[in-house]
Curated annotation (Swiss-Prot):
Biological process, per Gene Ontology: cell redox homeostasis
Record gene name: trxB
MF-aspect GO terms: protein-disulfide reductase activity
Known role: Participates in various redox reactions through the reversible oxidation of its active center dithiol to a disulfide and catalyzes dithiol-disulfide exchange reactions.
Keyword list, A-Z: Disulfide bond, Electron transport, Redox-active center, Transport
Organism: Nostoc sp. (strain PCC 7120 / SAG 25.82 / UTEX 2576)
Protein name: Thioredoxin 2
A Gene Ontology term for the protein's cellular component: cytosol
Cysteine disulfide partners in this protein: 33-36
Amino acid sequence: MSKGVITITDAEFESEVLKAEQPVLVYFWASWCGPCQLMSPLINLAANTYSDRLKVVKLEIDPNPTTVKKYKVEGVPALRLVKGEQILDSTEGVISKDKLLSFLDTHLNNN
């Protein structure tokens, strides 16, 4: 698996997320969002820590309204853990490193 966070758009969502073999953490963010700047290092950490069993992508909300609407993102930063068409879990707002790792471990250790 590749390490690191992949930047995607509405047009790439199906191929990068819905057709991925492993679960995908989708990080919804905005360039104007201060709290998103706090979350970015944690998203990178998750991508590197779980690279063997998780794909991590980020999607900027303003230029990608279709996916934002489909996944009912009401605020940023927001996370959706997706496997195929199924949302395994979601959260909105800044979360701590421990909460992020627990959020991921809950699902990835059961797969």
